[in-house]
């Protein structure tokens, strides 16, 4: 056996390992973009939670913000709205579920649909809801519209009361309430 034949196996082994390593790197470079595209994009991550300053919202008025591509109604209700919503018996409602992500499975009483203040008291003053009709996804009109002093969806005639509960029309459910909480006296965190 000559000296050249001893090196042939070593050269062959080197070429085999170098080719295999190159194949692994090329495969990884080709597969990584496919895996990485499944991660949430920066705009989705940014919209997961937002903070809304409600210090300028006067009693009896409403603020609409965009969250996750949908309108969110933030209403600071007056005493008349609160009394009207709390006077409705549960049996008079078409949907008796609160549809509140903060209180899953709760009944649709006014207290279960409103947002407690930063100190934990729930006076019923703050109501935060997705502004999307549960019938076909239209945006209801606010400013105490409709027959029940809440919201009215002009697309197909759904009427919601001052707590966002369906009272009349084709909508099957109450307006949804997103995960929300006060983080201080004047700031609400959505999501």
Swiss-Prot record:
GO molecular function, one term: metal ion binding
Listed EC numbers: 7.1.1.8
Keywords: 2Fe-2S, Cell membrane, Disulfide bond, Electron transport, Iron, Iron-sulfur, Membrane, Metal-binding, Translocase, Transmembrane, Transmembrane helix, Transport
Binding sites annotated in the UniProt record for [2Fe-2S] cluster: 133, 135, 153, 156
InterPro entries registered for this protein in UniProt: Rieske_2Fe-2S, Rieske_2Fe-2S_sf, Rieske_Fe-S_prot, Rieske_Fe-S_prot_C, TAT_signal, TAT_signal_bac_arc, Ubiq_cytC_Rdtase_Fe-S_su_TAT, Ubiquinol_cyt_c_Rdtase_Fe-S-su
Reaction equation(s) it catalyzes: a quinol + 2 Fe(III)-[cytochrome c](out) = a quinone + 2 Fe(II)-[cytochrome c](out) + 2 H(+)(out)
Topological category with respect to the lipid bilayer: Single-pass membrane protein
One Gene Ontology cellular component annotation held by this UniProt entry: plasma membrane
Miscellaneous comment as given in the Swiss-Prot or TrEMBL entry: The Rieske protein is a high potential 2Fe-2S protein.
Family, as annotated: Belongs to the Rieske iron-sulfur protein family.
SUBUNIT field: The main subunits of complex b-c1 are: cytochrome b, cytochrome c1 and the Rieske protein.
Free-text function comment from the UniProt entry: Component of the ubiquinol-cytochrome c reductase complex (complex III or cytochrome b-c1 complex), which is a respiratory chain that generates an electrochemical potential coupled to ATP synthesis.
Protein name per Swiss-Prot or TrEMBL: Ubiquinol-cytochrome c reductase iron-sulfur subunit
The organism of origin for this protein: Rhodobacter capsulatus (strain ATCC BAA-309 / NBRC 16581 / SB1003)
């Amino acid at each position: 056996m000559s000296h050249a034949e001893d090196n042939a196996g070593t050269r062959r082994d080197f070429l085999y390992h170098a080719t295999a390593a190159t194949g692994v790197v090329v495969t990884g470079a080709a597969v990584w973009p496919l895996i990485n595209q499944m991660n949430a994009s920066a705009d989705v991550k940014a919209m997961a939670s937002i903070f809304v300053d409600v210090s300028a919202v006067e009693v009896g008025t409403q603020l609409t913000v965009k969250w996750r591509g949908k309108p969110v109604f933030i209403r600071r209700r007056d005493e008349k709205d609160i009394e009207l919503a709390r006077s409705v018996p549960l049996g008079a409602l078409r949907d008796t579920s609160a549809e509140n992500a903060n209180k899953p499975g709760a009944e649709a009483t006014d207290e279960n649909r409103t947002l407690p203040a930063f100190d934990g008291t729930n006076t019923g003053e703050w109501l935060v809801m997705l502004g999307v009709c549960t019938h076909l996804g239209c945006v209801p009109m606010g400013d105490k519209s409709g027959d029940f002093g809440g919201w009215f969806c002009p697309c197909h005639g759904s009427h919601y009361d001052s707590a966002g509960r369906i009272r009349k029309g084709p909508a099957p459910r109450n307006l949804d309430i997103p995960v929300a909480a006060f983080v201080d006296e004047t700031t609400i965190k959505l999501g």
